Swiss-Prot record:
Compartments (UniProt record): Nucleus
Pfam families per the UniProt record, alphabetical: RHD_dimer, RHD_DNA_bind
A GO biological-process term: positive regulation of DNA-templated transcription
GO molecular function annotations of the record: DNA binding; DNA-binding transcription factor activity
Organism (species): Mus musculus
Residue span of region Transcriptional transactivator: 403-468
Motif (Nuclear localization signal): 291-296
Keyword Isomerase: no
Entry protein name: Proto-oncogene c-Rel
Gene name in the database record: Rel
Keyword set, alphabetical order: Acetylation, DNA-binding, Nucleus, Phosphoprotein, Proto-oncogene, Transcription, Transcription regulation
Length: 587
């Protein structure tokens, strides 16, 4: 029964989905499917629905297909499904069906050669909702077979109960065949990357559903900004792939910016669902130099860590170097065979002997091989020295490698005696029997002493119970060298130790090398150093070291290296460099 006061009309509750449905041919032999509603999802299927407003009662509904554009003409495609015949849907409904849902409607397409026959069939059946002229209906050139619209027409019963009163028809949104590229739903299936530089130019491969190469574009959108990807028709591969380059962003950025990327068809302004695309800020180090440096630094640090696991092997000290890295000045030896005299016998009756408190010692060896040079006589024995008697119980040495005799020493051996004259030498401590006191030399009765007597001194009667351990040169080499060397004063006897006091250390450190040496042309070989050796204690080497047999004259002999150590650490940067008697070492 019609409602009084208001005219009834038809309203579409849910429009059919425009895209995503495929039109089927009759030859496919299968159902054309159902037209989904526009709000349909995979989890919640919905269908087109309509409702008659201002009317409650029975009625009849007819649904036909018309063309996309106005004037809406009958379309050659057919509606198929339940309650469908001759290409259209028609059914009666009662007051209980509110609203009306159409879930079994499908679209079956016809071939192009069958289009005209289908239009004639519609005219004969009276299917012309908008009363378009017959001549215009037969003009099928402008008919788009890929797009249709649904027309909903309602008929109300008259007084006789026949459904003859028609309500104004209503047209739905267009429905596109998903199989046709010019009307199909646009969809981005996959891209090889979804980010790129803010400067643009990144090449992107995009896979999609069928598109027309002359009717498609890739669009980048963010608020009011819009840009398009750069590609040509040749970059569209078989309607399903597009290779394009990204456009540059509108401004420089410091942080990544996300925009929307979508496909758009210019002919109908259809767009696909959007996909996020991130613009990345421009790299400050475009060529990766910073990362290369970091990688190199990490490799170097790892190399250092790996090398740190290996302990450093102790290196053999080179010839002439000490344990602290100090070097001894190596000069030519006075002797041809490197002969070392043994230590003189020690006197055991010295009372009041102080306890040594300097345990570290040094030694100077005379084992350096060299050629025997000629030695001019540059020093003479003072005539004021008393004569020295020869003891018979304490010889100096009988173990010489060269022809060494008491009577063959040259007169240059007298140059050793001035070394015993210095006031500093007179204060040497008597901590061992091998020390000497030059003060006792003044009490000697003999005014002069021969070289043989000098090297035979070993008794308390001659040097006040303090014999000096010296090394004598060979007889055959005394007249051939211009650079003679005194042998050594040894500080390496653990039983005969001496310690320098703080005052002595300062004096030794302040001592000038020029005050400790004299040229070969000077009147004396040794210069008196009273300030330098004042109250300095020295000790002689023991017999075990001095009498070591088989001392090689080779400079690389380990025996020489072992006997070349000293530890008087305060003699830094001091070189006792007498060119005739000895070449003291450099620290």
């Amino acid at each position: 029964m019609a409602s009084s006061g208001y005219n009834p009309y038809v309203e579409i509750i849910e429009q059919p989905r425009q895209r995503g449905m495929r039109f089927r041919y009759k030859c496919e032999g299968r159902s054309a499917g159902s037209i989904p509603g526009e709000r349909s999802t995979d989890n919640n299927r919905t269908y087109p629905s309509v409702q008659i407003m201002n009317y409650y009662g029975k009625g009849k509904i007819r649904i036909t297909l018309v063309t996309k554009n106005d004037p809406y003409k009958p379309h050659p495609h057919d509606l198929v499904g339940k309650d469908c015949r001759d290409g259209y849907y028609e059914a009666e409904f009662g007051p209980e069906r509110r609203p009306l849902f159409f879930q079994n409607l499908g679209i079956r397409c016809v071939k192009k050669k069958e289009v005209k026959g289908a239009i004639i069939l519609r005219i004969s059946a009276g299917i012309n909702p908008f009363n378009v002229g017959e001549q215009q209906l037969l003009d099928i050139e402008d008919c788009d077979l890929n797009v249709v619209r649904c027309v909903f027409m309602f008929f109300l019963p008259d007084e006789d109960g026949n459904f003859t009163t028609a309500l104004p028809p209503i047209v739905s949104n267009p429905i596109y065949d998903n199989r046709a590229p010019n009307t199909a739903e646009l969809r981005i299936c996959r891209v090889n990357k979804n980010c790129g530089s803010v400067r643009g130019g990144d090449e992107i491969f995009l896979l999609c559903d069928k598109v027309q190469k002359d009717d498609i574009e890739v669009r980048f959108v963010l608020n009011d900004w819009e840009a398009r990807g750069v590609f040509s028709q040749a970059d569209v591969h078989r309607q399903v792939a597009i290779v394009f380059k990204t456009p540059p962003y509108c401004k420089a950025i410091l942080e990544p910016v996300t925009v929307k990327m979508q496909l758009r068809r210019p002919s109908d302004q259809e767009v696909s669902e959007s996909m996020d695309f991130r613009y990345l800020p421009d790299e400050k180090d475009a060529y990766g130099n910073k990362s290369k440096k970091q990688k190199t630094t990490l490799i170097f640090q790892k190399l250092l860590q790996d090398c740190g696991h290996f302990t450093e092997k102790p290196r053999t000290a080179p010839l002439g170097s000490t344990g602290e890295g100090r070097f001894i000045k190596k000069e030519s030896n006075l002797f041809s065979h490197g002969t070392v005299l043994p230590e003189m016998p020690r006197s055991s009756g010295v009372p009041g002997q102080a306890e040594p408190y300097y345990s570290s010692c040094g030694s100077i060896s005379s084992g350096l091989p060299h050629h025997p040079p000629a030695i001019p006589s540059v020093a003479h024995q003072p005539t004021s020295w008393p004569p020295v008697t020869h003891p018979t119980s304490h010889p100096v040495s009988t173990n010489t490698l060269s022809t060494f005799s008491a009577g063959t020493l040259s007169s240059n051996s007298q140059g050793i005696l001035p070394f015993l004259e210095g006031p500093g030498v007179s204060d040497l401590s008597a901590s061992n029997s091998c020390l000497y006191n030059p003060d006792d030399l003044a009490r000697m009765e003999t005014p002069s002493m021969s070289p043989t007597d000098l090297y035979s001194i070993s008794d308390v009667n001659m040097l006040s119970t303090r014999p000096l351990s010296v090394m004598a040169p060979s007889t055959d080499g005394m007249g051939d060298t211009d650079n003679p060397r005194l042998v050594s004063i040894n500080l390496e006897n653990p039983s005969c130790n001496a310690r320098l006091g703080p005052r002595d250390l300062r004096q030794l450190h302040q001592m000038s090398p020029a005050s400790l040496s004299a040229g070969t042309s000077s009147s004396s070989v040794f210069v008196s150093q009273s300030d330098a050796f004042d109250r300095s204690n020295f000790s002689c080497v023991d017999n075990g070291l001095m009498n070591e047999p088989g001392l090689s004259d080779d400079a690389n002999n380990p025996t020489f290296v072992q006997s070349s150590h000293y530890s008087v650490n305060t003699l830094q940067s001091e070189q006792l460099s007498d060119p005739f008697t000895y070449g003291f070492f450099k620290i």
